[in-house]
Each structure stands twice: as structure tokens, then as C-alpha cells.
Amino acid sequence: MEYRTEINYEKIKEGDALIGMRTQGIDGTHYPIIKVMLDRRPDLLHAKIDEEHFLLEEMMKANVAYTREIMSLQECGYLHGAFRVHNSLFRNKGWRELPDGLYACVDMTKIPVLPLFRFLYEQDMIGADVFPHRFHMGIGMVVAVPAD
């Protein structure tokens, strides 16, 4: 099978399901914000964010390359579109690629927030209203697939 098929958004249609794919790492756009937080509170660098994790080790986790998942969805004919989430679910250029007349709704209550992002949020250094517009909350890619 030829895997060089371009992923575009022409196949996305009303009723498709949008699935957020988990990433363990933070995006490169998050580092400047975290650096400002650490400049204000250097003690956070070695802080324990939950029973098992420290901030520094969580910051060092790599983002996921979704190659296997994307290729599998393409091979089955299920992939209608996909975009990488940089910075934020809300401020993502991928939403602009939806076909004319289609819109997406993100239910933030359905996203299980990783301990790293919960910890950063609880530091309350950038404001609760701003936080979801600056961090991807652990969703690294969104794929559009048939709802059934």
C-alpha cells in the first residue's frame, strides 16, 4: 500500500467523530510559558506533581509520532482528516481546515487531563481562563473518522 497519500480535509463530513489522541509530552510552544513559571518559582523544577511523577521528568517526555495509528486508519479507509495539536486545542490551525459550514465542538469535560497539565494549572500563574488556550492538555493529534 502506498502511504504517501496526502491527508487533507476533503473527506470530512457532518457527523464524523473527532478523536483526540493522547500525548505524554509537552509541545515546544509550551516551554517558554513553563520557563516563565520556573523563573517565578524555581522550586517547581524538582517538584513532585503526583505520587509517581516529578515535573522535570514529565517535561522531558517526548511527544508521540502517530505514524502507526495514522497509517492504520488510512489503510482501513477510516481517516477523513487529521491535524497535529500545537499549543492549544482551541487555538489550533487545524480547525480552520474543516470544510465550509462544518464546525467542531470540544467537550473539555471528556478530556482526562494528565497529571503534568493538572499540576501546571494548579500553580495558577497564567490564569484559569487562559490555561486551556495555551496548553494542549495532553491531546497531541485530532483525527476525523466516520462516527460509526
Map each language-model feature to its residues.
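Glycine-rich anion-binding loops of enzyme active sites
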Residues: 1-31
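Short, solvent-exposed coil/turn linker segments
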Residues: 2-3, 25, 43-44, 54-55, ...
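Generic structural "secondary-structure junction" signal
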Residues: 3, 9, 28, 40, ...
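Surface-exposed beta-strand edges and their flanking turn/coil or helix-capping segments
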Residues: 8-10, 32-36, 95-97, 118-121
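Secondary-structure boundary elements
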Residues: 10-13, 40, 75-77
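Short, surface-exposed linear patches
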Residues: 16-22, 40-44, 104-106
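Glycine-rich, acidic
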Residues: 26-72
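Glycine-/charge-enriched secondary-structure boundary and capping motifs
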Residues: 52-58, 64-148
